[in-house]
Curated annotation (Swiss-Prot):
It comes from Neospora caninum. Belongs to the 14-3-3 family. Coiled coil: none annotated. This is 14-3-3 protein homolog. Residues 154-177 are annotated as: Disordered. It holds the Pfam family 14-3-3. Signal peptide: none annotated. It comes from the Eukaryota.
Amino acid sequence: MAEEIKNLRDEYVYKAKLAEQAERYDEMAEAMKNLVENCLDEQQPKDELSVEERNLLSVAYKNAVGARRASWRIISSVEQKELSKQHMQNKALAAEYRQKVEEELNKICHDILQLLTDKLIPKTSDSESKVFYYKMKGDYYRYISEFSGEEGKKQAADQAQESYQKATETAEGHSPATHPIRLGLALNYSVFFYEILNLPQQACEMAKRAFDDAITEFDNVSEDSYKDSTLIMQLLRDNLTLWTSDLQADQQQQEGGEKPAEQADQ
């Protein structure tokens, strides 16, 4: 039986890798979902995903959702343009199409959230995996909050903040400031403050603290994580530059200056 499970697990991993190469991310996500649901032994607390499997799961769902988030932004923009032109029939068609994309987004996000909540987080024994999964949980609740109505947005935002906070507390207690997962968490949590909670000052403070802490410890960064760490640090710095500029522009606008530039999509 154990050998059968191992073979099935290897098969799902291979299918996921094959789907990734073919850029068929829905099928990649399906393979990894099947692995989590069918191959993790409920009786073995330490039977959890390997780092490779964990990364495959993350890549699959990130890309499946990412394509639809991009579609949602485009369709929402078209819908607003049709409204501004008073083309109400076209606006209604765009709204119907947007809702279709929202249904797809909602299903994918809730699929991965259910896996995280019911299967992965309860079986996690090490702090790195715990940070990774709570960060993922925060990310997918953040995505839900992007397209939900007021009540749904608040509920999703509360869940996202709770998950990001749990990840942050674990990361700060167990991971160096240069660790890519800890840096990626700070990046996404700060974006959450900026885009979802509309708290630019707190977003800047969080991003700056993560960047400064990493710089302080940078001499000790491991060779394995050097490339990933420096990439995320650059993204933190880019966001800081943009957000600081926007804050200054907002201040100028309040004083009668020019309107600030739009926030770039993450």
